[in-house]
Amino acid sequence: MSGNNHPGDASAEIDVVLVTGLSGAGRGTAAKVLEDLGWYVADNLPPQLITWMVDFGLAAGSRITQLAVVMDVRSRGFTGDLDSVRRELATRNIIPRVVFMEASDDMLVRRYEQNRRSHPLQGEQTLAEGIAAERRMLAPVRATADLIIDTSALSVPGLRESIERAFGGDASATTSVTVESFGFKYGLPMDADIVMDVRFLPNPHWVDELRSLTGQHSAVRDYVLGQPGAAEFLRTYRRLLSLVVDGYRREGKRYMTVAIGCTGGKHRSVAIAEALMGLLQSDLQLSVRVLHRDLGRE
């Protein structure tokens, strides 16, 4: 958020984003995207220098209006450092947005093994133990983050899109909603705020002519949405989400991920997610996108 009432320049404003999260989850890539969007990016700036950098940005004549700081878990007392930075910035009427990057344990292990690097908290432990230790350490940070991005199944272009949607312009007037389909057989999405199970609908997998298709095909979509209760479910769920979104806005939260799950993430969840996105887009104060996490995995 922007800050003002700085002693040196009452009209000064600066937007601050703190990028943190699990090592190997894409903090560096997120920082590069923010830099491409015109943000001034400070990578691994010591916590005690963050407020100094903000003061520099608030000073008369400074051209820094958007500051992104990548915070590294390897700094001792990391969680306390983050809390301290937030308190200091609050004295300047600045409430930074915190972006938390994460990925599944399996994906993090794969990335470290591919790059032949050790985890910063690994020490004499195994790689998996180092990842688990970091996840425990950062749990309080994740719990208070403004935006959580799970990069497990996210390509670099997909990550870029997520960052651009959140920070590419003035998002203060809108709430960004991601409707994510998934398959329960592959696990719950780690970044979901709300999870809905649509396995109560008949499975197109058992219809021979629909089995090889997906929820993006009209035949499957018509089959799923034509089931008794499907239309009423969508209308009811749309009203429920309206209440939730209003609550998010009152609390100052601007990002929400709604996960829709079926068995394999191929038919029912995809069709329902697409239909729900269409209903939500009728709200002019919502920026909505759909993401099909497990489509193509079968």
UniProtKB/Swiss-Prot annotation:
* Top-rank taxon: Bacteria
Q: Where does GTP bind?
A: 72-75
Q: Which InterPro entries match?
A: P-loop_NTPase (IPR027417), RapZ-like (IPR005337), RapZ-like_N (IPR053930), RapZ_C (IPR053931)
Keyword tags: ATP-binding, GTP-binding, Nucleotide-binding
What terms describe the molecular function in GO for this protein? ATP binding; GTP binding
Q: Where are the transmembrane segments?
A: none
**Where ATP is bound, by residue?**
21-28
Q: Which HAMAP family match?
A: RapZ_like
* Entry similarity comment: Belongs to the RapZ-like family.
What is the role of the protein in this entry?
A: Displays ATPase and GTPase activities.
What protein does this entry describe? Nucleotide-binding protein ML0563
Q: Give the species this sequence originates from.
A: Mycobacterium leprae (strain TN)
